[in-house]
Amino acid sequence: MAKRRRRRSRNSRRRRIRNAIRITLFFLIVVAIISGIILLVSKLINKGGETGDIGSDAAIEQPVGQEQEEKQGFFARLFKKKDKEQDGLFDEEGNPLATQPPEPTPTPLPEFSPYSVAGTSPSDFGLETKIEVDGSEMDASQYTAADVIDFEEGYKYTQLEGVITFRGNNFRDSPSYGTASMTEKKFDTSPWTFTVGSMQKMYGSGSWSGCGWTGQPLLIRWPESTKRIMNMRDWAKQKEGLIEAIYATMSGNIYFFDAETGQETRDHISTAFPFKGAGALDPRGYPLMYVGSGDDSPTEGKDTSHAFIISLIDGSVLYEFGKQDSFRIRGLSYFDSSALVDAETDTLIYPGESGILYLIKLNTNYDEAAGTISISPKVTKWRYKGAKNNTDGVAARDGFWLGMEDSAMIWRGHMIIADNGGHLMCIDLNTLQVKWVQDTLDDTNCTGVLTLEGEDHHPYVYMSTSFHPNWRARDTQTAPIPIWKIDAVTGERVWTNNDYNCQTIAKPNQVSGGVQGSFASGKNDLEGLIFVPVSMTEGMKGELVALNKSDGTVKWRYTFQGYPWSSPVPVYDQNGKGYIIQCTKSGYIHLFDGLTGTLLDEMNLGSNVEASPAVFDNHIVIGTRGGLIYGIKLK
């Protein structure tokens, strides 16, 4: 019995051992099969990743460490901890990273594809154009710009702080910069002043004195790195937050001031040519100034008026153009317009009174670290002639003048500009084809303003004209001065305000009536208003009128005893409350409540103010025909 029990016990142990062996063998076989599958998959993945083609025979050299990594096996690579550059979820210690919000999708710019309709076709005006590229004329229908010009909204024209072209940007809607923190809503009664000389006129008697029409100063707070390479005086380089005022004057000199104190920041530049227009700075922050003279030089040699590109590193002239251009039709070489620069294509856009539009590929080479700048210009010219434009061989009373004295507005790839002969033209800058023309009746000197309105950001232009004696009426009479809102897509008039009939004084003391100063478009609490200075409404009087953008009706108007050739400047306080600054022939600068037209303050500057002010925060800079430049603080 005992033997039988021992035998059963031994048999039971043997069965358990055999079962254990079977189970172990089973698991070993399973593990071997799985490992084989994993190894095969791993090799296939590695081979495909190395060659990009599993069937490729090409031998790929492995980077250092890759062979060792492969030896670690598929699981090691599969579960290897990734760094944040690989997946953006964990840092190199394996800790979760904070989730970054996605970049917002940029809002696409509204399309702008202008075209003509009945009454705005260029052919209705007998418009003819020609193009010259690098000195050779070409078929106007064959021209296409090598680099596409495409401007954005006016407020994106530059990242610089200040007012760097006439009325600030390509919409011509920003003659002031920053915020005017006013408590008293008054002019400070202790302005700084600087005396400017004069220059004998080339033709006739008298002299060009002080600052004339349009005469706006340029205001800029240069980046500190740019100041360091300029020929500024040491104290100016060291003054933190310096606001530099740059003023091209009719004395033939370009002056540089501290806008807060009137102290000269550097030596003036002498050119021997009188400047009426504002000039312009480069929107990219390059130390370049673009400026053209308003008359021929009476100095020794009696040189012809033209335009300059000046280095503001050392005051040297880098390039001159427009002098007795053989491509011109009209004999004048004056430049009262204020230029614009397309930053992306490095293109200077400069209209002239000769009737030529200059598009200059600058090929700028600026090395701030080395303190050097150079240009290698490539010039394209466009000119026009309409059926009613006269030429040098036709008396002025028998035909309207060629040429552009106002400053161009640009939106996307199209420029809108008026001329001396009663045309408002929309020009495609990439093909130099005229898209539409609107009749402005007379010699048009004012610079309009471009706005985008409504939910669809539809573009409009506000524009008016002047009264040139003997074209529409004799100089002893008056002529209508309409104010228009114009659809920038088609050139059609949206509304017309016909409130004004103006006079003009003939030569030798010619004073043109109508709108000579430029429009101001309200923003913030003035958003629905447009401001227009009208001259010679009754004798030497004039008005500043605020019109509703929607329909052209009058919101308010104020009558001056002296006409306003100067342009209105809106300024805004920290709450968006808007005020209007307006200067006049009587020598006064006025401050108005922009919504109501209430006169808040005025100051006598001593002589005729044809020039337009520019404002940086609380600091106004303005010049007079009497030869003084003023720096006035709003308080």
Predicted regions and their residues:
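Conserved oxyanion/phosphate-binding beta-strand-loop segments in alpha/beta enzyme cores
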Residues: 170
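Hydrophobic membrane-insertion alpha-helices, especially the h-region
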Residues: 24-39
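Extracytoplasmic/lumenal domain signature
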Residues: 101-152, 173-213, 218-291, 295-335, ...
